UniProtKB/Swiss-Prot annotation:
It comes from Oryza sativa subsp. japonica (Rice). Residues 1-145, 172-200 are annotated as: Disordered. The gene is LEA19. Disulfide bonds: none annotated. One of its GO terms (cellular component) is nucleus. Belongs to the LEA type 4 family. The keyword Coiled coil applies. Involved in response to stress. This is Late embryogenesis abundant protein 19. Residues 13-23, 30-42, 53-81, 88-97, 105-114 have a biased composition (Basic and acidic residues). Induction: Induced by abscisic acid (ABA). Keywords: Coiled coil, Stress response. It comes from the Eukaryota. Residues 52-81 form a coiled coil. Residues 115-130, 186-200 have a biased composition (Low complexity).
Amino acid sequence: MASHQDQASYRAGETKAHTEEKAGQVMGASKDKASEAKDRASEAAGHAAGKGQDTKEATKEKAQAAKERASETAQAAKDKTSSTSQAARDKAAESKDQTGGFLGEKTEQAKQKAAETAGAAKQKTAETAQYTKDSAIAGKDKTGSVLQQASEQVKSTVVGAKDAVMSTLGMTEDEAGTDDGANKDTSATAAATETTARDH
């Protein structure tokens, strides 16, 4: 009987040892899987953070490029307007001896129009640059259309200034010294003013 009891006790101990061993294996496998899942999650988080940083850098670079282009466009418009204004002054000085005070008055009007046009171009370019900066900060990628709009506005303004100056000087040069020429020149100045107003 004692032998039978010893045998049962031995089997119970053996079963307990097997159970503990299996439980240890299951626990070890669970720990390994948990560690592996943690590593994967950490790697995915790092990858996502890297992508976010890349996107932020790209947006920042695009915003900087847009700002530089807007600045270049503004400078080009300023240079063009300055050149047009200088040409008007040179032409006025050359023609003043032939046409007297009438041409001087018209030249002053042309200078004022050129200055107004330059101011409007500068203001429009500044507004466009501010809009570009705000859009970039908000993460919007509208740089291309904004730059195209700025370029068209500046071109339109510069062409308006040139047309106003050329119209004023051209009419004065063709019709210098006659009352009829003075009337035509006044009409041309009014038309140029209307064109410039529409461009604004």
